[in-house]
Regions:
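P-loop NTP-binding core
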Residues: 1-101
Length: 102
């Protein structure tokens, strides 16, 4: 399943929701967290989680714009679950995350 945490407003909890959902899903199977926000807060969080050796830690990548859809589709084939954290503005990246979600 592919989830997208999106909203056109910043500060509403998208990243918090995305990272907690990704960890919960990682306990159930192989999970990818796509950070599609230029602030890269989800990727920063994931790096901290790996450094502190908390388990499970979802695989994380940063993608932007149309790459969220194009590369996201290819990457998703290797995972049971995918969570996309999109930036808080109406953008190509946000719309690509919505198109990728199931």
């Amino acid at each position: 399943m592919i989830f997208a945490c999106v909203n056109t407003k910043g500060g509403v909890g998208k990243t918090t929701t995305a990272v907690h959902l990704a960890v919960m899903l990682a306990r159930q199977g192989k999970t990818l967290l796509i950070d599609g926000d230029p602030q890269a807060s989800a990727a920063s969080w994931a790096a901290w989680r790996r450094e502190t050796q908390y388990d499970p830690s979802p695989t994380t990548t940063c993608l932007a714009g149309k790459a969220i859809l194009a590369e996201g589709k290819q990457l998703a084939t290797g995972f049971e679950h995918v969570v996309v954290d999109a930036g808080g503005r109406d953008s190509v990246g946000l719309r690509s995350a919505l198109l990728l979600a199931q």
